[in-house]
UniProtKB/Swiss-Prot annotation:
This is NAD(P)H-quinone oxidoreductase subunit J, chloroplastic. Gene3D superfamilies: NADH:ubiquinone oxidoreductase, 30kDa subunit (3.30.460.80). It catalyses: a plastoquinone + NADH + (n+1) H(+)(in) = a plastoquinol + NAD(+) + n H(+)(out); a plastoquinone + NADPH + (n+1) H(+)(in) = a plastoquinol + NADP(+) + n H(+)(out). It is a peripheral membrane protein. Keywords: Chloroplast, Membrane, NAD, NADP, Plastid, Plastoquinone, Quinone, Thylakoid, Translocase, Transport. It comes from the Eukaryota. It is an enzyme of class 7 (translocase). The gene is ndhJ. SUPFAM superfamilies: Nqo5-like. One of its GO terms (cellular component) is chloroplast thylakoid membrane.
Amino acid sequence: MQGRSSAWLVKHELVHRSLGFDYQGIETLQIKPEDWYSIAVISYVYGYNYLRSQCAYDVAPGGLLASVYHLTRIQYGVDQPEEVCIKVFVPRSNPRIPSVFWIWKSADFQERESYDMLGISYDNHPRMKRILMPESWVGWPLRKDYIAPNFYELQDAH
């Protein structure tokens, strides 16, 4: 079954893949990394002016990484928002996605957290650096293949 967002993208010949609907009835779409920035701009112009959240996860050990965006469009009032979930999958060997910071400023800390925890680099982000872990930290702690160090320095406890 195709939702409103998917139908709109098909109408405008924008490449995507529908992943169905979640338990709340929100449509989930898969977008290729190279198409993401264009579709993000078009989504903003279409009315998705609120980035509710951005997160990322490791799909499987040695597999793909995913960056997830929850967009909201409020057209007919606050009590009737239209929502869509966008997933962008990237290989862990080259985890690069265009940043949407310049479209939705709320992506700032969220993209940085995804970088810090999973190593997904968001191209053209103005401050792409660690936000939770020390700059000297080696590796990406939320990757399923991450090997945790078996020692911690006293300075890391502060």
